[in-house]
Amino acid sequence: MINKKIKQQIVEALRENLKKYPSANKMAIAIGINAAQLSRILKGDWENVISDASWLTLARKFDIAIGLQSPIVAAETETYKFIITQLSLCQQQSLSAMLCDYAGIGKTFAARHYVKQHKNAIYVDCSQVKSKQKLIRQIAKEFGVDHTGRYTDVYADLVYYMRSLDHPLIILDEAGDLDYAAFLELKALWNATEYLCGWYMMGADGLKKKFERHLYNKKVGYAELFRRFGERYQRITPEGKEALEEFKRRQIAIVAKANGLTNIQELYVKTQGSLTRLYIELQKIKNVA
């Protein structure tokens, strides 16, 4: 059961998020409810408008802590600053880039945080939408474009809408999970919005290996897509074991201090430098406190 305090936080997040969309109807599509329901919720009518499951989905979408979860304070780690700068450039100048780096360094957190604060920027977790149709429909949904009709209509409407937006940005996280047809469709969508949309593809070693393998085997489409995304695999972490460990230690220290913790060495040992694991440790500590 979602209590009133959590619902109030969700409504505040909805009001803030509404600033990113040209209309309430567009945002309603993006968050998965209808415009009438959204209108009632924003006016304070919360009872029996949407299900608890829908409230839970909204809480997750806006990173609102529920139950035993506690909010985590964002910290400007090296990863955070690098990605925020890259995303800003890609959006402002309609550029495309690819980032391939270790898991657990804060790539996803930085990308999602950027999207919260910038109009016409969307985040897509490709591990959840691996096929061509699911990917394009999800992109359409995030922009507030109808995504439930015939696929050809959804694609055409999406292209038309993207071309009308002021500097849209699409962030593709876990892009290495996309299937071949989805990659080809990405190339087509990139072509249809050339110079009008920024793109940022992120992943770990799997994304880099996928491109390297298909480029080596000359699989159709990969060379063209690689060229469109800058023809290089960017990374944040330094080369060398010692330098990498020091990098991770610095990031752990920055996030821990931002969240009021001082036992840096203990946290580093427990997490092995992973910010994902640090999040779990922070939840444990805050729930005990």
Residue positions per predicted region:
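Sensor-1/coupling segment of RecA-like P-loop NTPase cores
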Residues: 98-103, 190-221
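Conserved NTP-binding/hydrolysis module of P-loop NTPases
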Residues: 133-149
